[in-house]
């Protein structure tokens, strides 16, 4: 059997895969099993921050792999302590809990928020307000946090204690807070799976003010938009707010599984021994790779992300067959007149890999994609959208 046949025979049917078997890659180029080359504008869904087989990242993880690959959290290791220090220094947060994915990072954020509320106001203050059209993960609790019924219907009953407000509707958010005994407000500043839709400045700042007034924790889910993808280190930094908790993953590990929950001053000591844990969380190899990523997310790199974003937006806005371009930094959604599936398929045939988010083409290129490759990929997408 070939690889697709092996996959369909032995792997659970949870993914609708594209008809491409990725064999190898280098930077923003990937080759399939037939040696056809593609420009990668998806990066494993915003994971490969510096593309495939990035030399500095490979050196970091290989050196650590040949030293200690795993020790458990019963002992100290250097990479996780150093990574936590760097994350706190770059964000102003105080403590970090490491896990293996965005869903796990969000689980930790939810647990920390509920424990803080129980400790300070009582266990009945457990409701977390999230936004409609949000996506926070696929565990039974992060599904409950996700404000999209399409993900809920097969898995009832979900974890209780979540309510949903309309995104960018501050009055509705206030109404939901008033109607429940709340622990926190949780949001993605750019709703990724919901269609790459940024929240407005007015709404985010209003939500932060509301949280402060009501003694609620503010949780920012930075799983997809975080780690430089927005053009700042984290997306919330575009809004001039300071969350109490930040969850992130994807691009932080650069290709290895790593989640992080950053805890601000108010909640830095809320998690105590035995209250949470993860066997693999803070794995030294994953953290070594993340250190390589995070050290390079500096001013010049972030400026280049913003410049590349401006290029894409300018090139596609108003182009034939393009209805709108939304998003932030190098996390963009392109609403097309043609069906999204057709656009993705035709781009693939022409050697460009893009993915979808609801009714949009989603663009998630490597942060360091060369301009020549970016220009070529955008040119292909423009032609496909125009039906040329």
Residue spans for each PLM region:
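Conserved N-terminal phosphate-binding loop of PLP-dependent enzymes in the Aspartate aminotransferase
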Residues: 1-388
């Amino acid at each position: 059997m070939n690889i697709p046949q092996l996959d369909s025979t032995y792997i659970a049917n949870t993914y609708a895969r594209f008809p491409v078997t990725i064999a190898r890659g280098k930077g923003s180029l990937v080759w399939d099993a037939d040696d056809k080359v593609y420009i990668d504008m998806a990066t494993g869904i915003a994971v490969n921050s510096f593309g495939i087989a990035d030399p500095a990242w490979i050196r970091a993880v290989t050196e650590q792999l040949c030293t200690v690959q795993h020790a458990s959290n019963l002992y100290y290791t250097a990479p996780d302590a150093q990574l936590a220090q760097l994350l706190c220094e770059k964000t102003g947060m105080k403590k970090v809990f490491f896990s293996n994915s965005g869903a796990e990072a969000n689980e930790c954020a939810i647990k920390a928020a509920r424990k803080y509320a129980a400790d300070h106001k009582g266990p009945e203050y457990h409701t977390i307000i999230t936004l409609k059209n949000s996506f926070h993960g696929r565990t039974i609790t992060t599904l409950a946090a996700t404000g999209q019924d399409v993900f809920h219907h097969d898995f009832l009953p979900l974890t209780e204690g979540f309510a949903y407000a309309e995104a960018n509707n501050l009055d509705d958010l206030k109404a939901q807070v008033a109607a429940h005994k709340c622990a926190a407000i949780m949001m993605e500043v750019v709703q990724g799976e919901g269609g790459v839709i940024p929240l407005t400045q007015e709404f985010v700042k209003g939500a932060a003010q509301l949280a402060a007034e009501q003694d609620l924790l503010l949780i920012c889910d930075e799983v997809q938009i975080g780690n430089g993808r927005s053009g700042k280190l984290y997306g919330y930094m575009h809004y001039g707010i300071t969350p109490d908790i930040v969850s992130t993953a994807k691009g932080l590990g650069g290709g290895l599984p790593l989640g992080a929950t950053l805890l601000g001053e108010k909640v830095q000591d809320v998690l105590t021994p035995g209250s949470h844990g993860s066997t693999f969380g803070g794995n030294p190899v994953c953290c070594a790779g993340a250190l390589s990523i995070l050290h390079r997310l500096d001013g010049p790199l972030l400026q280049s992300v913003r410049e590349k974003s401006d290029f894409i937006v300018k090139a596609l806005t108003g182009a034939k067959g393009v209805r709108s371009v939304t998003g932030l930094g190098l996390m963009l959604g392109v609403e097309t007149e043609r069906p999204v599936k057709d656009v993705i398929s035709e781009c693939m045939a022409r050697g460009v890999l893009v993915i979808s988010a609801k009714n949009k083409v989603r663009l998630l290129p490597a942060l360091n994609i060369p301009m020549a490759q970016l220009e070529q990929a955008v040119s292909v997408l423009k032609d496909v959208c125009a039906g040329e």
